[in-house]
Amino acid sequence: GSTGYSMAAGGPIVEPTAHNLLLTPICPHSTRAGSYVLAPEHTLVVETADANRKFVYLSVDGGKAFSLKNGDKVRVRQSKFVTKLVRLSKKSFCEILDSKMGAEARKHEK
């Protein structure tokens, strides 16, 4: 799920009940680019600024990619809508991580 994708891109493990906005760059140009964990009341604004780029695309959760032009702004904020999920297991988040990732997950449980 989203935890695995974020980790594969160098992002953190975030406990599901934490109400945060998480932005993890995928294949960033700079090795100093890290994940951003923001409180849910913040709005993140990303603006395309380099006129020399021919193609800039935005893809969210693997959905259809949208082409962006120079100066376009994308605002990301917490939705006012809430989705209820069905929990099929009585295992805790850390137990599920441990079953999928083994010892690596135990480092984050403590």
Model-derived features: where do they sit?
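Catalytic phosphate-donor-binding core of small-molecule kinases
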Residues: 4-110
